């Protein structure tokens, strides 16, 4: 209920997109989006767990154009060092989920916040994308491939012009890779300022850094920019 009120308040103050972090299966998405116009506001659900049964409860949300689910099993492996369950079980559930939500989501922000340079971020992200495309290449029909939405979560730092170039390069690289597998060549990019250069003790410095980072995200062509709290 608190999250819903915060989201509605943010929308009333001008927010055009909302990102919900879903920590477990007890969270009701229907209650989260009460009083929110899902036709005009983009909604992102970042699931911190893997459950095909949970996703299937919300079939009325799944096919809406501006609603995105973030489920990234390789990203979870990179972050925690473990699968949710096992390699085989995770891929089986992931396949069911992707067939339902029509979305592949890849988290590049993990690599940026871990200290990877821009070339490494793009390389690791494309490598991860290639793993997913290779897995689904034989299981999805051509028409289904074209309907899949591709979502990239990206963090940007203070290297202004290079961050702009990174986002533009990401679209070019994805286009090249997707063409090889026959997938949708358009991608949706969500950008969040990096946490790597932020301090607990000087919020004014944080504000200056996030300002330039968000500006580079806008000029780089991000679809959604989610700033960090002041």
Which residue stretches match the model-derived regions?
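Gly/Pro-rich turn-and-neighbor structural signature
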Residues: 123-197, 205
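Acidic-glycine-rich active-site phosphate/pyrophosphate-binding loop
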Residues: 102, 187, 220
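Conserved, mostly hydrophobic/aromatic
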Residues: 14, 174, 220
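Non-catalytic positions within long, well-ordered alpha-helices that form the structural scaffold/packing
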Residues: 11, 217-218
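Active-site-adjacent loop and "lid" segments of alpha/beta metabolic enzymes
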Residues: 201-214
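Catalytic alpha/beta active-site cores
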Residues: 1-156, 224-228
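Active-site or pore-adjacent capping/gating segments
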Residues: 212, 221-230
């Amino acid at each position: 209920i608190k999250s819903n009120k915060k989201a509605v308040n943010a929308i009333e103050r001008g927010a055009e997109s909302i990102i919900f972090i879903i920590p477990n299966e007890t969270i009701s998405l229907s209650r989260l989006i009460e009083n929110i116009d899902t036709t005009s506001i983009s909604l992102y659900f970042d699931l911190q767990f893997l459950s095909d049964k949970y996703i299937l409860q919300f079939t009325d949300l799944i096919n809406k154009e501006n609603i995105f689910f973030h489920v990234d099993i390789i990203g979870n492996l990179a972050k925690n060092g473990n699968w949710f369950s096992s390699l085989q079980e995770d891929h089986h559930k992931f396949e069911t989920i992707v067939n339902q939500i029509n979305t592949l989501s890849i988290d590049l922000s993990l690599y940026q916040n871990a200290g990877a340079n821009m070339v490494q971020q793009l390389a690791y992200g494309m490598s991860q994308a290639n793993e997913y495309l290779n897995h689904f290449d034989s299981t999805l029909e051509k028409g289904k491939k074209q309907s899949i939405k591709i979502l990239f979560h990206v963090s940007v730092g203070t290297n202004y012009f290079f961050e702009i170039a990174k986002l533009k390069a990401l679209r070019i690289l994805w286009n090249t890779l997707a063409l090889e597998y026959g997938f949708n060549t358009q991608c949706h990019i969500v950008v969040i300022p990096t946490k790597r250069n932020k301090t607990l003790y000087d919020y004014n410095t944080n504000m200056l850094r996030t300002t330039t980072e968000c500006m580079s995200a806008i000029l780089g062509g991000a679809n959604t920019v989610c700033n960090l709290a002041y």
